[in-house]
């Protein structure tokens, strides 16, 4: 294929032209054209999309609360918890399989467990994805906590959106209590309040 020459407005000697090629086409570029082409290049920046969800917990007792979940790109999910009306002490806190509260919190089903493992602590390798451990209520019955977990994403096949968060009556034994329910529920007792996880604007 014949060479193509870009000519600048001012006369240039033949030795001042630069030669390059692309797609089989030979192109002679004047130095100022080459500088212009490279100096205007800006790298592509990909901005990660943050996601946010909320769950409003209600029950048949005075226990209630609000939980927010946020996730940046594909990173872990940060869960901010504030629940009131609890008895002082530890209470199991889990993500359950279903966002169904038609018959109260019992309709939310078992813990969210896509990997079909036994119950454990949040830091355990073998655990339910929905095992979020315990929250601690103070003398006024208020529990505030921040949980960071990488098994409860807000998007993808294991998204927690549409599932339910549940706070329990008793302390979760984290699968280590030796009770017949330890490896399924942590023997955390009844379900005091629950709420469906739904997306909200960031």
From Swiss-Prot:
Give me the Gene Ontology terms describing cellular component.
chloroplast
GO MF term (any one): superoxide dismutase activity
Alphabetical list of PROSITE patterns matching this protein: SOD_CU_ZN_1 (PS00087), SOD_CU_ZN_2 (PS00332)
Q: How is the cofactor bound?
A: Binds 1 copper ion per subunit. Binds 1 zinc ion per subunit.
Its annotated compartments are: Plastid, Chloroplast
Cofactors demanded by this protein: Cu cation; Zn(2+)
* Gene3D superfamilies reported for this sequence: Superoxide dismutase, copper/zinc binding domain (2.60.40.200)
The reaction(s) this protein catalyses: 2 superoxide + 2 H(+) = H2O2 + O2
Q: Which domain of life is it from?
A: Eukaryota
Q: List the disulfide bonds.
A: 105-194
Annotated transit peptide: 1-48
* EC number from the UniProt entry: 1.15.1.1
Name of the molecule in the record: Superoxide dismutase [Cu-Zn], chloroplastic
Residues binding Zn(2+): 111, 119, 128, 131
Chief subcellular site? plastid
Subunit structure, interactors included: Homotetramer.
Q: Which PANTHER family match?
A: SUPEROXIDE DISMUTASE CU-ZN -RELATED
What is the originating organism of this protein?
A: Pisum sativum
Its biological function?
A: Destroys radicals which are normally produced within the cells and which are toxic to biological systems.
Q: Which UniProt keywords apply?
A: Antioxidant, Chloroplast, Copper, Disulfide bond, Metal-binding, Oxidoreductase, Plastid, Transit peptide, Zinc
Q: Which InterPro entries match?
A: SOD-like_Cu/Zn_dom_sf (IPR036423), SOD_Cu/Zn_/chaperone (IPR024134), SOD_Cu/Zn_BS (IPR018152), SOD_Cu_Zn_dom (IPR001424)
| Similarity comment: family membership | Belongs to the Cu-Zn superoxide dismutase family.
Residues annotated as binding Cu cation are 94, 96, 111, 168
Task: Tell me which Pfam families the record gives.
Answer: Sod_Cu
């Amino acid at each position: 294929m014949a060479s193509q020459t870009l000519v600048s407005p001012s006369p240039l000697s033949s030795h001042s032209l630069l030669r390059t090629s692309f797609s089989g086409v030979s192109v002679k570029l004047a130095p100022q054209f080459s500088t212009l082409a490279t100096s205007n290049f800006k790298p592509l920046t990909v901005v990660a999309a943050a996601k946010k969800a909320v769950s409003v917990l209600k029950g048949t007792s005075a226990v209630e609360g609000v939980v927010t979940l946020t996730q940046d790109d594909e990173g872990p999910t940060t869960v901010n918890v504030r629940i009131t009306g609890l008895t002082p002490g530890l209470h199991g806190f889990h993500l359950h399989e279903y966002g169904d509260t038609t018959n109260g919190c019992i309709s939310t089903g078992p813990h969210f467990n896509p990997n079909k493992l036994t119950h454990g602590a949040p830091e355990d390798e073998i655990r339910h994805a929905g095992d979020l451990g315990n929250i601690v209520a103070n003398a006024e019955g208020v529990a505030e906590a921040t949980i960071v977990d990488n098994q409860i994403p807000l998007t993808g096949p294991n998204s927690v959106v549409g599932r339910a968060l549940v706070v329990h009556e008793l302390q979760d034994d984290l699968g280590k209590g030796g009770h017949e329910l330890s490896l399924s529920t942590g023997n955390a007792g009844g379900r005091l309040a629950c709420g469906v996880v739904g997306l909200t604007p960031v």
